[in-house]
Amino acid sequence: MAALNEFVSVVVSDGSRDAGLAMLLVSRPPTNALSRQVYREVIAAADELGRRDDVAAVILFGGHEIFSAGDDMPELRTLRGAEAETAARVRRDAIDAVAAIPKPTVAAITGYALGAGLTLALAADWRISGDNVKFGATEILAGLVPGGDALARLTRVAGASKAKELVFSGRFFDAEEALALGLIDEMVAPDDVYDAAAAWARRFLDGPRHALAAAKAGVDAVFELPRAERLAAGQRRYVEVFSAGQGGDAGADPHGG
């Protein structure tokens, strides 16, 4: 079943094997350039996926040819003043919306993941890439800096020194280097990308959903909240999980006794 906007769609499997598996599909040929409209549609799709009870895990996909070549540069060049601020905000909100989906998310990366396209991939929990994919934090080549919290996400994974080198140079790098840097979690043949991402996501379809959501929020909070707020939020999620009846097997001793 699909809910279709112009460029972004939500597709939820109704098959018995993959019941609960959904796809957030960006389709704006030929490069999946990310315009303000695309970002708004991503926000709406991410919100829908987060709310739907029939969705347990999500694959972020740009199709079999390309993930995304980044921001719509012709559109960006026309923006001035308040319009530029709005564009920056909607980009950040879209990246944050994907990162905040309270379910396991896997980016299936094909072709190119450049600039904001790389940032969008980094918003997923895991990334599966074809062995021929080219990556790049390429904004500097257009006289820009990465937006949408890209610098923090890239630094979190690759470290400050490597993040600076990639951002300052804007150079392309291949999937093998991305794997070595931890930017992707698995590298497969180009034709196997979606299936590999589905296999990764499939492991979580039968998991305790409230607990998975709480665990994801807790890990993300390590990077986003001060310690006192993080501990308070963690305690609140712990109680909420048990209140929802998702506290695990009542007959099991959590301490192994």
From Swiss-Prot:
Write out the similarity annotation: Belongs to the enoyl-CoA hydratase/isomerase family.
- Annotated InterPro entries: ClpP/crotonase-like_dom_sf, Enoyl-CoA_hydra/iso, Enoyl-CoA_hydra_C
Organism for this UniProt entry: Mycobacterium avium (strain 104)
Site description Important for catalytic activity, residues in chain: E139
The gene is echA17
In terms of Pfam families, this protein maps to: ECH_1
An annotated GO BP: fatty acid beta-oxidation
Domain of life per record: Bacteria
Q: Which UniProt keywords apply?
A: Fatty acid metabolism, Lipid metabolism, Lyase
Tell me what this protein is called: Probable enoyl-CoA hydratase echA17
Which leading EC class covers this enzyme?
lyase
